[in-house]
Amino acid sequence: MFGLIKRWKALSALGIMGINRRNADYVPKYNQRHLYPIVDDKIITKQRAIEAGIHVPEMYGIISTEKEIERLPEIIGERSDFVIKPAQGAGGDGILVIADRFEGRYKTVSGRIISHGEIEHQLSSILTGLYSLGGHRDRALIEYRVTPDQIFKSISYEGVPDIRIIVLMGYPVMAML
């Protein structure tokens, strides 16, 4: 325990800030509260990025209601790999990554074989807000599956690593992987 505290203090002395401090001391102070719904929703963020000319994974479709779940076969078509995400999820919770498809079943990136019904259940769980910030009703987005380059294999854990550049008052102040 004391070793962990020592390590944390050493990192802090080097100017390395943890995510908790960032979230507590900087996010509320430098971001307008009324803009949170834009950045907390992956669908809105993706649409804004596209409008700004930023390349993002192709979005195949959005499911907003239980009734729309029956549109899943139409949305994914013949694609053998895709990703389903909660629009307002955080920390990777609720994300289902399909790597292959065969004989009416799907294979996740972890190697688990699941049925179409299990995917529908996951979509339903997303819509009820099981994975959303604050537990509110949500939407599911289905999009292109990004496969990371092998260079990231030794430094990333579960999922596709993303590189984030944190900009404060117009200046890049930190980055994270």
Segments predicted by a language model, with ranges:
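Detector for methionine-enriched segments
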Residues: M1, M17, M59, M169, ...
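Conserved oxyanion/phosphate-binding beta-strand-loop segments in alpha/beta enzyme cores
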Residues: M1-G18
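Generic detector of short alpha-helix boundary/capping microenvironments
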Residues: G3-K6, P37, K153
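Short alpha-helical interface elements
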Residues: M17, E70-E74, I166-V167
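A conserved helix-loop-beta module that forms one wall/lid of the active-site cleft
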Residues: R22-S132
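Phosphate-binding site of ATP-dependent enzymes
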Residues: S110-L177
